[in-house]
Amino acid sequence: MKAFNTLLLLSALPATVITAQTASFDDVKDRELPANWTNTKTGKGEPKWTVEKDDTAQSKPNVLKQSGEATYPLCLKNDTSLEDGFVEVKFKSVSGDTDQAAGVIWRCQDADNYYVCRANALEDNVVLYKTEKGKRSSLDIVGRRGGYGVEVKVAPQTWHTLRVEFSGSRFKVLLNGKHLFDAEDATFAGAGRVGLWTKADSVVMFDDFSHGTN
């Protein structure tokens, strides 16, 4: 009877629902922007986000490509509002003289207020920032004072997977499945949009953009 009562108690507990969505961009017409996405920027310039066919696409045939130039080009997914969960994308740095950076955005309030984690193929590092009122600042790594992200090889012309898991003020950063570091910040505590990010003249391809709760 005791075991039976335990089963009844467990069955009455609310189930943890894990939801995730993935955008592969394969149902979008060539040279167009996906529906429910916004092409915007932090700062000045002219970002250019388009879906294009590419033989190296991780889920063929299409990728989402940023080929314009701006301070920080953004592509935000409008139909999202995520407080705790994850965001993940596959990316390939194609070119860029000033920068070759690819990032994911979460808890985005608008084009001037959000969190972003980016990998850089010119600097060979991964850094997590907050952008507040249009000003970007890097966050300290948990357990370390100062410094600038983590040095790690980010080969150009190669597909990588960048993922950030976030719960409350804690953020966990992974590159190609390897846990690089954690960071903490409580500037943006509520839900916000998710999206993609580049910098300056970075030409980057993105594929299999995923987000959800966990």
Give the residues covered by each predicted segment.
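Positively charged n-region of N-terminal signal peptides that target proteins for export
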Residues: M1-T6
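Extracellular glycan-recognition surfaces and repeat-rich motifs
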Residues: E32-V63, A70-T71
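Short, aromatic/His-centered strand-loop micro-motif at the edge of beta-sheets
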Residues: K135-R163
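Ligand-recognition surfaces built from glycine- and aromatic
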Residues: S24, F188-N214
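Secretory/extracellular carbohydrate-interaction modules
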Residues: Q66-R136
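Bacterial N-terminal signal peptides
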Residues: L7-T16
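Short, solvent-exposed beta-strand-to-loop segments that form ligand-recognition rims
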Residues: L174-R193
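Extracellular carbohydrate-recognition regions
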Residues: A20-K41, D207
